[in-house]
């Protein structure tokens, strides 16, 4: 059990059955317990990510959902993005590819640069890593047969 407010993995344990083994179910969801109140049950914060999605980039724990929230916050972009992670010498580098909304097709380089800079600054502020950001026309990011885009391309040597 972690102290209140500390982020950790949500695990369910059955304690009410007698003569039954203790079974723990790992959800792999990351959350935190909120400070106790006068209620009889504890409150939990929102799910902030998944422990199996976490990547370590330059010593910072990064979840793809953090990048997704930032991309979705910009009305000029669709929710589709890709993270291309590579290693340059000893340092990890991240390039985020975003896709414009269909009505923004043909946007000039200056406007694309402003959008990319906005995303880049938000990632630096909220996630804590420096990235390069590229903004592409609609329907540029490759999708699978189900219509989803692969989110993370980790090209670092293992």
PLM region spans:
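Active-site glycine/GP-rich loop and adjacent strand/helix microenvironment
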Residues: 1-158
């Amino acid at each position: 059990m972690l102290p209140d407010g500390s982020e950790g993995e949500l695990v369910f344990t059955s304690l009410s059955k007698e003569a039954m083994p203790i079974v723990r179910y790992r959800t792999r969801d990351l959350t935190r317990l909120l400070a106790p109140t006068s209620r009889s049950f504890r409150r939990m914060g929102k799910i902030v990510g998944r422990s199996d999605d976490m990547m370590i980039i330059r010593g910072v724990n990064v979840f793809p959902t953090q990048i997704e929230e930032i991309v979705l916050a910009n009305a000029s972009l669709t929710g589709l993005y890709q993270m291309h992670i590579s290693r340059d010498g000893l340092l990890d580098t991240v390039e985020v590819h975003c896709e414009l909304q269909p009505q923004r097709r043909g946007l000039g380089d200056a406007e694309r640069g402003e959008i990319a800079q906005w995303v880049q600054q938000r990632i630096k502020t909220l996630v804590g890593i420096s990235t390069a950001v590229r903004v592409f026309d609609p329907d540029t990011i490759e999708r699978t047969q189900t219509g989803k885009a692969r989110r993370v391309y980790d090209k670092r040597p293992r």
